[in-house]
C-alpha cells in the first residue's frame, strides 16, 4: 500500500498495527518484481478479515485517465455499468471502507472485444501498486461452441467454431501462475480510498467491484450431515466435450481413438469425443457444464478421465457447484497419472453426496495447483537463491574461471557455507514433500537431488566451486524447468455422470476382445478412409490442393485442424497438409511439387523464382488486399525482376531485454544508443558480467548472425545493396565503418561469440542483450523466478547529426509460395489469402500457444493479428514501434555468396586479427564478381 494510505490509516483511526505494517510495506517500491505477494501476505497475515462486503458500482464515482475511453451506460442487458472500450488507460473509483481489514476483490465484468483473448489489468490502491502481482491481473475471456458437433459428407465430425460467451461473469482477482490457489488479499484501513484499474489489455464492461471475504467452506463431514440421495433412482450421462462455456478459446472438443469405451466412438470415422488434454492445463482455466436433475436432493458425481501427459505427477481441480465450492475437500481434487482411461468417482472410496437443485445446475472444474502449491513456491525460492549465489560467484571468478586457482569462495562470499547448507536442506525438503504427494522419485524431481549433491560438494570442497559454476547454472535451469512442468495440470474428460447410486458412475466396458475388434477395424479403415478429404457439410467438392509445411508435427496438426474446420467449409477446397523437408528445387525438377508451400525461409523464393519454379503472384485479383495486411517492407525479400513470388506468413526481429534488478544495483539505465551501450559494457565487465549481442547460434559455433551488421548499417542511413541491386555497399565508407564497429564488439570488447542467452540472462551474468521478441514469452514461461525483474525495450539506435535516433532493425521471416507446377493455382491462392488473413493468423497463434506455451508464441506477419495474441496493450505498442522501424533484406541472384563472404571476413578479423578495412574490401570483390556472374547466367544484364 502507498505512503498516502499509511497516512490515511493514522488520520482515520487506524490502529498502530496498520500504521507500522503500512510503513514497512513502503520500504521499497511495491510495483517491481522484488516485492512479491508472498512478502505482502506475510506482512498482513494477522490482519482481520471482516465479513462485510463493500460494493463499488461500475458507473459511480469514477474518473477515467491516461486515454481510457470509459463512460457509464447500459450493456449486455444490464444498466448502470462502466463501458471501458479502449485497451489502455486507467479508471479510478472513490469508495469508503467501514473498518480496517484484509479483503479479496472480485469483478462482475463483460468482455467487449470479440477478437481479444483474456483481459489484463493492473490494480492500484490509493495510487500505489500493493505488490508486484497486482500489476499483472488476468480476467478470462470465455467461449463456447457456436453449434453442436456436425458431420461432413464423409461422416467425419467437424469441430464447432468457438465464439465468445457473451454473458456477465464474476471473477475474483488472484494468481494465474500456479503459485497460489486463493484470491489475493488486499489490506485497507477504514475510511476513504481510491481503487484504480490500469488497462494492459482492457476492453471491458464492469458492473461492480466487490471487496469481500469468502467464508471458508465447511468440511465434507459437516456438509453431508443428514444427507440422503434424492428419492427416485436417477442416472444421466453428459458428454464432457459439450460444456456450457469455458475460459479459453482453445478448450474445444478433441478426439480419442484409443478406446472403444470412449463416448461416442467409431473405429474409422473421426469423432470429437473428449475435451481437455494439454489445452486444459494452465492455472485458473476452467470448464463449466450444465447438468439437470428431476428433484432437489443429493447426488453422486463421476467422470471418465485420463491424465496421461505429465508423467509421474498429479493434476488438480477445484469443483464449484452453482458458483461456489460446496465443502473444503472440493477445493483440491487429485487426478493421478495413468496412461489408461479411469472411471473417477468424486470422493474416491467414500463417494461425495453433492446437493443439486431441481432443474439445471452448473458444475465447474478449475485448474489449481492443489497440494503442489507449497512445492511450487519453494522451488521458486530455491531457484532464486541458487541464481543469486551463482551471480555472486562469477562476480569474483568471472564466467570462465581459472580452475587451478583457489578463489577462496567460502571466505569471499559472506555466510557462504550457511547459505549453501540452507539451500541443500531446502532442496531435500522440497523433494521429500513432492514424493510424499505421490510424485515419482525417479522422474522430473530427480533434478532436485542432483542440485543437492552439488551443493553438498561445495561445502565439503569449496575450492572446487569455480570448476562447477556452469553445472550450478545448468542445475538451476533444470529446477526452473521442473517448476514449469509441475505448474502444468493437464486433464482429459470423456463423460460426466450424475446419479443417485454409485454403481451407475462407472462406464460400461466392452472388454478386451471388444477393444481388439475396435483396433482391428481402425487399422483396416486406415487403408481406405481419406481423412484428409473433409468437405463442407453436404456440399460435394473435387477441388483439392497439396500443402507442404516445413515445421514440426504440432504446427502441422494445428494447421490441419484450422484448414479442415474453417478453410474447407468456407471454400469447398480440401487442403491436404504434409510435413516435408525435401528441397523445393528438387521437387520442382522432379514434377512432384505441391500446390502451396508454407513457412518457406525468406531466401528461397527468389532463388526458386529465377529458375522458373514459382508462380508470380501480382496478377491475382486480391493481391493488393492481401499485401495490405503487412508492414510496407515485408514484401521486399520476395521481389524478383519486377514481380512478387511469395506472401509473408511470419516475421520476427530483435528487441532488447535487460535485468532491472541488476541495473538498479549497478546504478545503470537501459541504453538509448550504441554509445550508451559501450558505457554499460565497461561497467558490467568491471563486475565480471557481460552483454549479449547476437553472433553465433547457441547450438552451432560455426554460425554467424549477420543481422547485427545489417542493423548497424541501416541505422547509419546506408543500404545493403546499391539502388540497381548489382553490388553491395560493404566497401563504402559507411559500410567499412559499420563492419569495423560490428567486429569490435567481439575483438576489442571481448563479448562472447556463442552463448545461451536464456540461461545466462536468468542467472544474471548476462543482464542485457538482444534477442527475437518472442524471447519475452520464453522468459515468462521458463523463468518464473525472475518475473518482474526484467523488461523488454527498443534496441539501441544510432543518433544522426540532427539528434534523432535511428532504431532500424533487421527482420527475418517465412512465407508462402505457389509452385509453378500447381494444378489449381486459383485454389492455391485462395488458401494463401486465407492463411495470411487476420482471423487465421490469430487462431493459429492462439492454438500454438495453448499447445506449447508462451515460449512458442507465433510471430505473425499480419499486423492486426499481433493484437489478438497474448500481448498486453503496452507490449503491443512497444513491439509495433520497433516493427515499424524494421526492414527485410532484399534477395538477389547470388545472395548466398553475400552472407558466406561476410561471415568469412568477420572470422578473419575477429579470430585472426586481420585489418578490417582491407578484409571487407577484399571479400566484397569476391561477392560482386559472383553477383555479376549470376546476373549474366539468368540474363538480367
Language model feature labels by segment:
Residues 724-754:
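Glycine-centered hinge/linker elements that transmit conformational signals in sensory
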Residues 523-541, 602-655, 678, 705, ...:
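Hinge/lid segment of periplasmic solute-binding proteins
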Residues 386-606, 917-941:
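Conserved N-terminal structural module of periplasmic/extracytoplasmic solute-binding proteins
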Residues 609-612, 631-672, 689, 696-725, ...:
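Periplasmic solute-binding protein
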Residues 793-797, 846-904, 908, 936-941:
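Long, aromatic- and glycine/proline-rich binding clefts that accommodate carbohydrate-like moieties
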Residues 19-499, 811:
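Extracytoplasmic
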Residues 99, 295, 783-856, 884-891:
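Extracytoplasmic/periplasmic substrate-recognition and gating elements
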Residues 565-633, 637, 661-672, 765-768, ...:
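Extracytoplasmic "Venus flytrap"/periplasmic binding protein-like
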Amino acid at each position: 500500500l502507498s505512503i498516502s494510505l499509511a497516512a490515511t490509516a493514522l488520520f482515520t483511526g487506524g490502529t498502530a498495527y496498520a500504521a507500522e505494517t503500512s510503513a514497512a510495506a513502503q520500504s521499497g517500491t511495491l510495483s517491481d518484481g522484488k516485492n512479491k505477494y508472498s512478502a505482502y501476505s506475510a506482512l498482513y497475515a494477522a490482519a482481520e478479515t471482516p465479513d462485510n462486503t463493500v460494493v463499488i458500482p461500475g458507473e459511480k464515482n469514477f474518473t477515467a485517465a491516461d486515454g481510457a475511453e470509459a463512460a457509464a451506460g447500459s450493456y449486455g442487458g444490464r444498466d448502470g455499468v462502466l463501458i471501458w472500450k479502449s485497451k489502455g488507460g486507467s479508471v479510478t473509483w472513490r469508495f469508503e471502507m467501514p473498518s480496517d481489514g484484509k479483503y479479496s476483490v472480485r469483478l462482475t465484468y463483460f468482455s467487449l472485444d470479440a477478437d481479444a483473448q483474456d483481459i489484463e489489468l493492473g490494480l492500484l490502491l490509493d495510487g500505489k501498486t500493493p505488490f508486484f502481482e497486482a500489476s499483472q491481473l488476468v480476467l478470462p475471456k470465455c467461449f463456447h461452441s457456436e453449434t453442436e458437433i456436425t458431420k461432413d459428407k464423409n461422416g467425419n465430425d467437424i469441430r464447432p467454431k468457438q465464439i465468445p460467451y457473451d454473458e456477465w461473469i464474476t471473477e475474483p482477482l488472484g494468481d494465474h501462475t500456479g503459485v497460489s490457489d486463493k484470491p489475493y488479499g488486499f489490506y485497507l484501513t477504514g475510511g476513504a480510498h481510491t481503487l484504480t484499474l490500469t488497462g494492459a489489455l482492457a476492453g471491458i464492461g464492469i458492473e461492480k467491484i466487490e471487496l469481500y471475504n469468502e467464508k471458508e467452506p465447511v468440511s465434507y463431514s459437516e456438509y453431508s450431515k443428514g444427507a440422503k440421495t434424492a428419492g427416485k433412482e436417477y442416472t444421466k450421462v453428459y458428454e464432457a466435450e459439450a460444456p456450457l462455456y469455458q475460459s479459453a478459446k482453445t478448450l474445444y472438443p478433441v478426439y480419442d481413438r484409443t478406446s472403444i469405451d470412449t463416448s461416442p466412438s467409431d473405429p474409422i470415422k473421426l469423432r470429437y469425443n473428449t475435451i481437455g488434454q494439454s489445452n486444459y492445463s494452465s492455472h485458473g482455466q476452467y470448464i463449466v457444464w450444465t447438468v439437470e436433475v428431476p428433484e432437489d436432493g443429493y447426488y453422486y458425481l463421476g467422470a471418465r478421465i485420463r491424465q496421461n501427459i505429465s508423467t509421474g505427477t498429479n493434476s488438480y481441480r477445484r469443483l464449484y457447484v452453482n458458483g461456489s465450492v460446496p465443502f473444503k475437500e472440493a477445493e483440491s481434487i487429485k487426478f493421478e497419472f495413468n496412461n489408461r482411461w479411469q472411471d473417477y468417482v468424486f470422493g474416491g472410496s467414500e463417494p461425495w453426496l453433492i446437493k443439486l437443485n431441481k432443474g439445471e445446475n452448473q458444475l465447474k472444474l478449475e485448474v489449481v495447483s492443489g497440494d503442489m502449491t507449497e512445492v511450487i513456491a519453494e522451488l521458486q525460492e530455491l531457484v532464486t537463491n541458487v541464481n543469486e549465489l551463482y551471480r555472486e560467484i562469477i562476480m569474483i571468478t568471472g564466467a570462465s574461471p581459472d580452475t587451478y586457482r583457489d578463489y577462496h569462495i567460502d571466505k569471499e562470499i559472506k555466510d557462504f557455507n550457511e547459505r549453501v547448507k540452507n539451500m541443500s536442506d531446502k532442496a531435500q525438503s522440497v523433494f521429500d514433500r513432492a514424493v510424499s504427494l505421490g510424485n515419482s522419485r525417479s522422474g522430473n524431481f530427480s533434478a532436485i537431488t542432483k542440485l543437492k549433491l552439488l551443493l553438498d560438494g561445495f561445502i565439503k570442497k569449496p575450492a572446487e566451486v569455480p570448476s562447477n559454476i556452469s553445472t550450478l547454472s545448468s542445475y538451476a535451469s533444470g529446477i526452473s524447468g521442473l517448476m514449469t512442468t509441475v505448474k502444468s495440470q493437464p486433464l482429459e474428460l470423456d463423460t460426466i455422470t450424475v446419479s443417485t447410486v454409485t454403481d451407475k458412475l462407472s462406464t460400461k466396458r466392452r472388454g478386451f476382445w471388444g477393444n481388439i475388434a475396435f483396433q482391428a477395424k481402425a487399422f483396416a479403415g486406415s487403408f481406405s478412409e481419406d481423412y484428409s478429404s473433409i468437405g463442407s457439410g453436404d456440399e460435394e467438392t473435387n477441388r483439392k490442393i497439396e500443402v507442404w509445411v516445413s515445421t514440426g508435427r504440432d504446427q502441422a496438426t494445428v494447421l490441419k485442424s484450422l484448414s479442415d474446420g474453417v478453410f474447407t467449409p468456407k471454400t469447398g477446397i480440401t487442403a491436404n497438409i504434409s510435413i516435408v523437408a525435401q528441397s523445393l528445387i528438387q521437387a520442382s525438377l522432379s514434377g512432384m511439387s505441391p500446390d502451396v508451400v508454407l513457412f518457406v525461409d525468406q531466401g528461397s523464393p527468389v532463388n526458386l523464382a529465377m529458375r522458373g519454379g514459382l508462380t508470380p503472384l501480382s496478377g491475382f485479383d486480391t493481391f493488393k488486399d492481401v499485401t495490405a495486411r503487412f508492414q510496407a517492407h515485408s514484401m521486399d525479400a520476395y521481389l524478383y525482376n519486377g514481380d512478387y513470388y511469395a506472401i509473408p506468413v511470419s516475421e520476427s526481429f530483435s528487441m532488447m531485454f535487460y535485468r532491472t534488478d541488476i541495473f538498479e544495483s549497478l546504478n545503470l539505465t537501459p541504453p538509448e544508443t550504441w554509445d550508451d551501450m559501450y558505457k554499460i559494457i565497461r561497467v558490467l565487465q568491471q563486475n565480471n558480467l557481460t552483454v549479449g549481442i547476437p553472433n553465433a547460434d547457441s547450438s552451432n559455433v560455426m554460425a554467424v548472425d549477420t543481422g547485427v551488421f545489417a542493423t548497424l548499417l541501416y541505422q547509419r542511413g546506408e543500404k545493403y545493396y546499391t539502388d540497381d541491386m548489382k553490388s553491395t555497399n560493404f566497401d563504402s565508407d559507411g559500410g567499412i565503418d559499420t563492419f569495423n564497429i560490428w567486429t569490435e564488439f567481439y575483438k576489442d570488447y571481448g563479448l562472447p561469440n556463442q552463448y545461451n542467452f536464456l540461461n545466462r540472462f536468468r542467472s544474471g551474468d548476462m543482464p542485457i542483450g538482444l534477442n527475437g521478441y518472442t524471447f519475452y514469452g520464453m522468459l515468462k514461461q521458463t523463468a518464473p523466478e525472475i518475473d518482474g525483474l526484467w523488461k523488454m525495450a527498443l534496441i539501441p539506435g544510432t543518433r544522426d547529426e540532427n539528434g534523432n535516433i535511428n532504431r532500424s532493425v533487421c527482420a527475418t521471416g517465412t512465407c508462402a509460395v505457389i509452385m509453378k507446377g500447381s494444378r489449381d493455382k486459383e485454389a492455391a491462392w485462395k488458401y494463401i489469402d486465407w492463411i495470411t488473413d487476420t482471423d487465421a493468423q490469430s487462431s493459429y497463434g492462439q492454438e500454438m500457444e495453448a499447445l506449447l506455451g508462451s515460449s512458442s508464441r507465433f510471430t505473425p506477419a499480419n499486423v492486426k493479428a499481433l493484437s489478438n495474441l497474448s500481448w498486453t496493450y503496452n507490449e503491443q505498442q512497444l513491439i509495433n514501434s520497433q516493427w515499424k522501424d524494421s526492414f527485410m533484406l532484399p534477395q538477389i541472384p547470388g545472395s548466398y555468396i553475400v552472407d558466406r563472404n561476410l561471415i568469412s571476413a568477420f572470422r578473419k578479423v575477429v579470430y585472426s586479427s586481420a585489418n578490417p578495412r582491407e578484409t571487407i574490401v577484399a571479400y566484397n570483390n569476391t561477392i560482386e564478381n559472383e553477383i555479376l556472374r549470376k546476373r549474366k547466367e539468368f540474363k538480367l544484364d
